[in-house]
Amino acid sequence: FSTRTGAGIAALRDHLEEACRRALALADNSFHPDMRYFRQYMEMRLQQCRVLSRLAGSLQRLGPECRPFPWQADEIGIFFEEVAASLHEYNNALELLERLEEHRHRFKLSELPASRREFETRAVLYEAADSLQHLLELKRDFVRALTPSQIETFWACPMRPRGGKKGTKTGRI
């Protein structure tokens, strides 16, 4: 993938690794039993960074020879932007996973590719959708593993973004 993208992902990975070290130190220096939350959160973000690295490598294969892109590329690109804007600490990813499944369903109902180039392009898009699903599943699984005490301690924050009530798809659990 491009040098700029690769450097950005490498810098992100470095920051996340440092955050993991600091979260571990915080947990080791605290009497609060749920301080492992920060370490778990940073580890989940580090795993997501690895997925992003693979995703960037896949998307790099969509060079100029793949143009014009099929309509699926526009749709998945817009969805990627929506995920980037909404996947914050307090989002459990359930709604995003449902929406990704809806996109996949529409893709399956579409006509078969008309050329080898379109087939290969759509295969890369399918691979990208798989990576995005894995990224979202990492977040969903992190949230599912939270203890009630962690939810109360770390997610009952007054600065928590709006968009859901406890027990809803966009809420805390």
Residue ranges and their predicted role:
Residues 1-38:
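Non-transmembrane accessory domains of multi-pass membrane transporters/channels
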Residues 36-159, 173:
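Soluble C-terminal extramembrane regulatory/interaction domains of multi-pass membrane proteins
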Residues 160-164:
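Short, low-complexity, intrinsically disordered N-terminal modules
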Residues 165-170:
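Polybasic, lysine-rich low-complexity intrinsically disordered segments
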